[in-house]
Amino acid sequence: MKEYWTSLASLLGVLAFCQSLMQSIFPPELRFAFLKFFNRIFHVFSSYCYFDITEIDGVNTNELYNAVQLYLSSSVSIAGNRLSLTRAVNSSSITFGLSNNDSIVDTFNGVTVLWEHVVTQRQTQTFAWRPLPEEKRGFTLRIKKKDKTLILNSYLDYIMERANEIRRKNQDRLLYTNSRGGSLDSRGHPWESVPFKHPSTFETLAMDPRKKQQIMDDLKDFAEGQVFYQKTGRAWKRGYLLYGPPGTGKSSMIAAMANYLGYDIYDLELTEVHSNSELRKLLMKTSSKSIIVIEDIDCSINLTNRKKNSSNVSSQRSYYDAETRNGSGSGSGGSGEEGGNGNTITLSGLLNFTDGLWSCCGSERIFVFTTNHIEKLDPALLRSGRMDMHIYMSFCNFPSLKILLKNYLGYGVEDINGDVLKEMEMVVEKAEMTPADVSEALIKNRRDKEKAIRELLEDLKSRGERNVKDGKLRGGSGNLTELEVVEEQEKRAIDSQNEDEDHDEEEIELEDNICKTRED
C-alpha cells in the first residue's frame, strides 16, 4: 500500500511538471485551439446531441423556456432527487422546481432524454441599453443522435401542450402591476405579480341574469374563437368598457371575467408610464390569455373629450388622421408633462396600444377600461374595434337585489314576505342605491336577518323619497329605465364625436384652401 501511494504521488508530480511545461512552451491561443479541436472530435464520435434553451431570447422572454420550466415542475416532484421548493405570498400551493445545475431524466415515446438546468453568473457589463439579470438561466436537452429526427419536434410540441394544460388547471391566477417608474425586477421584467385570489364570480355578481348571460356568452365565444378570428383576418383580442357610478361592481366584474376564463390580470397604472414607447414595452411583456385593465381611465391621464380642450390643441395638424392629430396635441393626450410627473403618453399612443399594430404582438387578450363618466372620454376610445362591448354598471335593481339577498342572507324569493318583496320592487329603482351600499346594509345586520330586511327597506324608501323630492332621479332626467339611461349617455358621446369630426373637417377644408391659395 505504501508503494502504491508513493507511485501515485510521483505520477501527480510528473503531471504537474508537464502542465507547467505546456503553459510555458505553448501560448494560450494554441492551447485554446487544441481544446476546441478536441471538443469537435469528441462531438463527432459522441452518440448524443445537445440543445440549449435560454431564458431570454434577444429582448423577450423565451416562451419555450417557460413551458419547459412548467412541464418539468410537474414531473420533478416524482422523479427528481434534488428539488427546489417555493411558495409565493398568498399562494395555496407549493411549486416544485429543478435545482440549479441539476438534471432529470424524462421519457417520451419510449425514448429517454436528459434535462439539465444550467445557471451561471453573468459577466459584468460596462454598458447595456437595458439591465439584464445577474444570472444566466437555461435548460440543456440531451438526446441521442439516432432519436433526434424521430422525437425532437413532436416532443417540444408535447411540452408546449402540457404546459398550456397545466396553466389551465392551475387555480392560482396572477395579478400583475407595472413597476414604479418603469423599473425592472431582478429577472428584467417590468411587471410585478402576486397570486390573484378574488372570490368574485358571475354567480355572485349583482346584475340582471340576462345581462350576465349575454356577457358570459360573449366571453365564451371570444375564448373559443381562434379559428374565427384567423378566418376573418382580425387580431384575437376584444375590448370591454365598464362604466357607471362608483360602487356598482366594475372591479368585481373584472375579477369575475378573470375567474370565468382562467386568465391572468395586468392592472396597468398609466400614471407610472412616462412615454408611448414605455407603454409598448409593457404590452410586449404581457402574456396570452390575459386581461389588461386600465381602471378610471378618465382620471389616469388627460384623455377626456378633445372638444372640451380644443383651445389647447396645436394649430398645426396633419390632413389624414384626426384621432392621431388630436392625440399628439397638448390638449388630448398630454404631450408634455402631465401633472408635473413628466408623463408624455398621447391619445394616439393609447389607441395604438389597444388596436394598433403593437396590439397584435400577442393573442387571446382582453382590454378592459373602466370609468365613472363615459361622457368625459374622448370618442376615439369608444368606437368598435377598441371597445367592442359597452357594459353599463347600473344602480341596484330588483334582479340584482335578489342576488344580494341570496348572497348575504341566504334568502330566496320564497323566504321573504310577499308584501315586503313587492315594496322592495317598487322602491329599489327610485332609491338609486349602488350594490355596494346595499351590501353594506346587509353585512352590518347579517346576524339578524329580519332586522337586515327591515332596515334595508326603510333605507330604500327614504332614499327614493329624497331623490323624487330633490329631482335627482337618474341625474335629473326623470324616472328612466336602465336601457334609456344607457342610450342617453352613449348618445351624448356619439353627438360629441360627430361635433368633433365636423370641427376637424372644417379645419382640414380651411387648410386645403390655404394651400391652394399659396400654389396659385
Curated annotation (Swiss-Prot):
Pfam families registered for this protein in UniProt: AAA, AAA_assoc
EC number: 3.6.1.-
Domain of life: Eukaryota
SMART domains with a match to the protein in the record: AAA (SM00382)
Bias (Acidic residues) ranges: 497-512
Amino acids binding ATP: G244, P245, P246, G247, T248, G249, K250, S251
Keyword Signal among UniProt keywords: yes
Cofactors required: Mg(2+)
Region (Disordered): 307-340, 467-520
InterPro entries noted in UniProt: AAA+_ATPase, AAA_N_dom, ATPase_AAA_core, Mitochondrial_chaperone_BCS1, P-loop_NTPase
Family, similarity comment: Belongs to the AAA ATPase family. BCS1 subfamily.
Listed name of the protein: AAA-ATPase At5g57480
